[in-house]
Regions:
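Basic, helix-initiating cap at the start of DNA-binding domains
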Residues: 2-53, 57-62, 78-79
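Amphipathic alpha-helical linker/stalk segments
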Residues: 23-24, 45-54, 61, 82-112
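Short hydrophobic/aromatic patch on the recognition helix
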Residues: 64-74
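Residues in the recognition helix of alpha-helical DNA-binding motifs
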Residues: 73-74, 83, 199
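Amphipathic alpha-helical segments used for helix-helix packing
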Residues: 85, 96-97, 117-142, 183-184
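Amphipathic alpha-helical packing segments from all-alpha helical-bundle domains
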Residues: 118-125, 138-171, 198-209
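Amphipathic C-terminal alpha-helical segment
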Residues: 170-193, 206-211
Length: 211
C-alpha cells in the first residue's frame, strides 16, 4: 500500500482523503450557532439597557426569532442563564483582578475600593438583574454564591490583615466592600462615584481601627 501523497506504481495518484477539518462547514450548523448567539446577545443587551427581568418573549423579539426557536436552543431560561454565565464569567471576573496590591494598609484599602468601584459600575445592570431573578433560579443562586465567595477571597488577598480581625469586623469589612452597599450609596442615597468611594473608604478604615 502506498503512502498518501505519493504516486502508486501505475503513476496514478492516490485518492486524497480530506480530514473533517478540511470539509466545508455545515450550513445548518452555522445557522444554528448564529441563532443561538443572537439569543444570548439579546438577553445581555436587554439587561444592559435596564430590563432586569427579561422574559423569553422579550428575548425572542430582540433576537428576531420566534419563541419556539429560543426553547429549541435552550430547554428553559435556566439553561440560557447558565450558558451566559459560561460566556461572561472570564470577562467579569477579570474586572476584579490585578491592581496595585502593594503599599500600606490604607493605600491598599483605597486601591481595592477603586478596583471594585470600576467593576461595580460596569456590572451594575447584570448584578441587579441577577438579584432580581435569583429567588426563582437555582442556577443564578449558585453562581451568585460562587461569585460572593470569590470576591471575599479576593478582598482577603488585597487586605490580608482581615485574618486578624474579630469575626464581627470581618463581616463588617465584607459588607462595606459589597455591591449591595455600593448600590445603596449610588442608587438610594444618590451619591456620586467619588463620594461613594469615600464613604466605603471611611467604613473600612473604621473596621480596621485606622485613626
Amino acid at each position: 500500500m502506498t503512502k498518501a501523497g505519493k504516486r502508486s506504481i501505475g503513476n496514478k495518484p492516490d485518492a486524497v482523503i480530506h480530514s473533517p477539518e478540511e470539509k466545508k462547514p455545515d450550513g445548518r450548523l452555522l445557522r444554528t450557532e448564529r441563532s443561538r448567539q443572537l439569543i444570548i446577545d439579546a438577553l445581555c443587551d436587554l439587561v444592559q439597557e435596564g430590563v432586569l427581568v427579561p422574559t423569553a418573549q422579550t428575548v425572542a423579539e430582540r433576537a428576531g426569532v420566534g419563541i419556539r426557536t429560543v426553547f429549541r436552543h435552550f430547554a428553559d431560561m435556566e439553561a440560557l442563564f447558565a450558558t451566559i454565565d459560561i460566556q461572561l464569567r472570564e470577562s467579569y471576573e477579570g474586572l476584579y483582578l490585578g491592581g496595585d496590591r502593594d503599599g500600606s494598609l490604607e493605600e491598599r484599602i483605597r486601591h481595592a475600593i477603586e478596583r471594585r468601584a470600576a467593576a461595580y459600575e460596569k456590572l451594575s445592570s447584570l448584578m441587579l438583574s441577577t438579584r432580581a431573578l435569583m429567588w426563582r433560579s437555582p442556577v443564578l443562586q449558585k453562581n451568585y454564591a460562587r461569585n460572593q465567595r470569590g470576591l471575599r477571597k479576593d478582598l482577603a488577598d488585597w487586605l490580608p490583615e482581615i485574618a486578624a480581625l474579630p469575626a464581627v469586623r470581618k463581616e463588617a469589612v465584607d459588607a462595606a466592600a459589597s455591591f449591595e452597599t455600593w448600590d445603596r450609596l449610588r442608587s438610594q442615597q444618590g451619591l456620586s462615584t467619588r463620594a461613594s468611594m469615600e464613604v466605603v473608604h471611611e467604613m473600612l478604615r473604621l473596621a480596621f481601627g485606622i485613626g
